[in-house]
From Swiss-Prot:
UniProt subcellular location: Cytoplasm, Nucleoid
Record function comment: Involved in control of chromosome replication initiation. Inhibits the cooperative binding of DnaA to the oriC region, thus negatively regulating initiation of chromosome replication. Inhibits the ability of DnaA-ATP to form a helix on DNA; does not disassemble preformed DnaA-DNA helices. Decreases the residence time of DnaA on the chromosome at its binding sites (oriC, replication forks and promoter-binding sites). Tethers DnaA to the replication machinery via the DNA polymerase beta sliding clamp subunit (dnaN).
Protein's recorded name: Replication initiation control protein YabA
Residues engaged in binding Zn(2+): 80, 82, 97, 100
Superkingdom to which the source organism belongs: Bacteria
UniProt keyword Cytoplasm, yes or no: yes
Stated family: Belongs to the YabA family.
Organism listed in the record: Streptococcus gordonii (strain Challis / ATCC 35105 / BCRC 15272 / CH1 / DL1 / V288)
Amino acid sequence: MDKREIFDALDDFSQNLMLTLAEVEAIKKNLKSVIEENTVLRLENDKLRERLGEVEKTGPSKGGGQGRENLERIYLDGFHICTDFYGQRRDNDEEECAFCNELLFRE
């Protein structure tokens, strides 16, 4: 191999290395996003399990108002109680969900 061929091979190797580095960075970014989402979901899961434990300890509801109170507590904890989005976390706790409110305040 002459010097020119060695230089070209080294240049090609360098370009391939740069592309591989860019791919690794993209994978790292994606992994970070997945880990963050996983953490949020684990926290939600823990909160829901805690809530379920509280509900199971209280036993079956004796009055019709207790079910509504439980739904209201779940809603105030930041979760949807409407049939369309039940159990999903509300994006913004300050914003009200019209479907959930209709269910809560229905007579």
